[in-house]
Amino acid sequence: MTKNSSTVFTHARIATLEEKAANLGLIEEAALVVKDARIVYAGPENKLPDEYASFEKIDCGNRLITPGLIDCHTHLVHAGNRAHEFELRLQGATYEEVARAGGGIVSSVRNLRAASEDDLVRETLPRLDALIAEGVTTVEVKSGYGLDRDSEIKSLKAARRLGEERDVAIRTTFLGAHALPPEMNGDKAAYIDRVINDMLPAIAEQGLADAVDGFCEGIAFLPDEIARVFDAAKAHDIPVKLHADQLSNLHGAALAASYGALSADHLEYTDADGAAAMASAGTVAVLLPGAYYFIRETQKPPVEAFRAAGTKMALATDNNPGTSPLTSLLLTMNMGATLFRMTVEECIAGVTREAARALGILDQTGTLEIGKDADLAIWDIERPAELVYRIGFNPLWKRVFKGQI
């Protein structure tokens, strides 16, 4: 298929993921038409308009078409790994002991600062390729391991380059308020000053951030410190999102909602009031079962409270070197179901429609509706539940990005 090709996918089953449709919007004996990288028809094959008769045809053999998958929370750009720390923790070392030995996020900061932009792109591409191989068409990538202006800019530029190296959409997020760098000697107020007066203006001027994020936690930054960052982001007209309530309830979910955040992420310790605030604000709950699993957390996010409040839920890998070295959205869906008791429908919507909502791009992608980008994943499966049920098996038949296979 060429960039401006016109193609009909025939003999398919289609899960449109439309907002109000039941059963994932599943249409049997369906066809989907792509023209100029957009979806122009998705519906019963026997109602296919005659105007598409001359288009190139691809027989899907009764396979299932879903929207291309979206990984809406990653720290994909990083240098090195922390496998040695993993071994130390298995031997009983605490996080504090690892940090005192020069590990933890400090080691990731040290590695990233030492790497060139080219190094970062080269090291990140295999992780990105692993996601693409599972039908992922959009990936969010955060900075946050540089923690100074030049290194944060380097990270975001490397992330943007990933979208030039591969057929994938990249959404970049500035996460300067991720941790306190060692050179600040514990002075969080002075560091937040740097984030809002030095880093953010330079990043905004270069148009490098689609969103601004922060880590609201006792080991990172408190709500009043995050609020300063969010006020600055709003002044630059950049939407916000937040790592919230992962290790304790600092009411980060409610803070995110008060700023109309695109999403609040992690949320293991969020309470019912936080869930309700998010629902009212339209803030998506991005759940990250990979991190929950990897750090052996026991407090589950309040899925029932999110359901009761009507809070939208997404799933993501949270790929990062310290707490979730995960590059599989398929496994993430299984974890969402088995660990968090999410339904099949919630899991699949969580890596398509709701993931798009969490990035503020639901008008472009995330469902198979007329006018949206032709980002598709075609699966050799009999029923949608297989995407969530299987572990370590990839049933992807074809991946289509903006109309191109």
Curated annotation (Swiss-Prot):
Keywords, sorted A to Z: Cytoplasm, Histidine metabolism, Hydrolase, Iron, Metal-binding, Zinc
Cross-referenced Gene3D superfamilies: Metal-dependent hydrolases, Urease, subunit C, domain 1
- The record lists Zn(2+) as bound by 73, 75, 243, 318
Residues reported in the UniProt entry to bind Fe(3+): 73, 75, 243, 318
Cofactor: record remark: Binds 1 zinc or iron ion per subunit.
Sites binding N-formimidoyl-L-glutamate sit at 145, 320, 322
- Provide the protein's localization: Cytoplasm
Q: Which GO terms describe its biological process?
A: L-histidine catabolic process to glutamate and formamide; L-histidine catabolic process to glutamate and formate
* Natural source organism: Brucella abortus (strain 2308)
Swiss-Prot/TrEMBL cofactor(s)? Zn(2+); Fe(3+)
Official protein name in the record: Imidazolonepropionase
Q: Which residues bind 4-imidazolone-5-propanoate?
A: 82, 145, 178, 246, 323
Q: What does this protein do?
A: Catalyzes the hydrolytic cleavage of the carbon-nitrogen bond in imidazolone-5-propanoate to yield N-formimidoyl-L-glutamate. It is the third step in the universal histidine degradation pathway.
Broadest EC class?
hydrolase
Q: Which reaction does it catalyse?
A: 4-imidazolone-5-propanoate + H2O = N-formimidoyl-L-glutamate
Please provide, alphabetically and separated by semicolons, the GO molecular function terms listed in this UniProt record: imidazolonepropionase activity; iron ion binding; zinc ion binding
Q: Which E.C. number(s) belong to this protein?
A: 3.5.2.7
Membrane-spanning parts = none
Its main localization is cytoplasm
